[in-house]
C-alpha cells in the first residue's frame, strides 16, 4: 500500500483528518491522521498530528513509550520537567510516565509523526497536585500560562 502525500495540504491520500481527541481533554487547534493502524504482523499505530499556529496538544502522561518525529514547522515540547525547542527533523523519545505537551510557535505550524503500540493504556491528565509541582518551576509555569 502507498499513501501519496500532498505537501501543499500536509495530508495523505485515503486518510481522514480527524479531531485530535474526543474525550474532553484540553487542547487547542490540533488534528490527527491515522496513517497505519496495526495491520499484518506489526501491532502499532502510526499517526500524524498537526497543531495550528498557537495550538497545543493535551498536557498528559501514560504508561506507554512513544516515538515522535517533528515533520513540519517548529515549536516547543514540554518533556518531563524541561522545555525544548523543536523543529522539523527532530526525533523525540517519550518514555512511559513522562509528562509531555507539544506546542506550535505563534505564526508557525508544528506537525509530528507519532508511533505507539496499538494496544496501550489510556492517557492520564495531571492531578491538581501534579500541576502544582509542575508550576513550582518558573519556566514551566510561564510556558503553561503563555497559551
Predicted regions and their residues:
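Glycine- and acidic-residue-biased ligand/ion/polar-headgroup-sensing regions
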Residues: 64-66, 70-75, 80
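A short hydrophobic beta-strand segment most commonly corresponding to one strand
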Residues: 93, 107-125
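Short acidic-glycine-tyrosine-enriched beta hairpin
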Residues: 81-96
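Short histidine-centered beta-strand/loop micro-motifs
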Residues: 37-38, 56-62, 103-105
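Conserved short histidine dyad/triad with adjacent acidic residue
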Residues: 32, 47-62, 96
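A short, N-terminal "cap"/entry segment at the start of jelly-roll beta-barrel domains
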Residues: 1-43, 128-147
Amino acid at each position: 500500500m502507498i499513501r501519496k502525500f500532498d505537501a501543499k495540504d500536509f495530508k495523505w491520500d485515503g486518510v481522514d483528518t480527524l479531531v485530535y481527541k474526543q474525550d474532553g481533554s484540553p487542547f487547542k487547534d490540533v488534528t490527527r491522521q491515522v496513517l497505519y493502524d496495526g495491520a499484518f504482523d506489526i501491532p502499532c499505530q502510526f499517526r500524524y498530528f498537526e497543531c495550528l499556529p498557537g495550538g497545543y496538544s493535551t498536557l498528559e502522561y501514560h504508561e506507554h513509550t512513544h516515538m515522535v518525529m517533528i515533520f513540519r514547522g517548529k515549536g516547543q515540547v514540554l518533556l518531563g520537567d524541561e522545555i525544548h525547542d523543536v523543529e522539523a527533523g527532530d526525533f523525540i523519545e517519550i518514555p512511559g510516565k513522562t509528562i509531555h505537551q507539544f506546542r506550535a510557535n505563534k505564526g508557525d505550524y508544528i506537525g509530528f509523526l507519532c508511533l505507539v503500540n496499538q494496544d496501550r493504556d489510556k492517557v492520564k491528565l495531571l492531578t491538581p497536585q501534579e500541576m502544582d509541582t509542575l508550576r513550582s518551576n518558573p519556566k514551566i509555569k510561564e510556558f503553561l500560562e503563555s497559551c
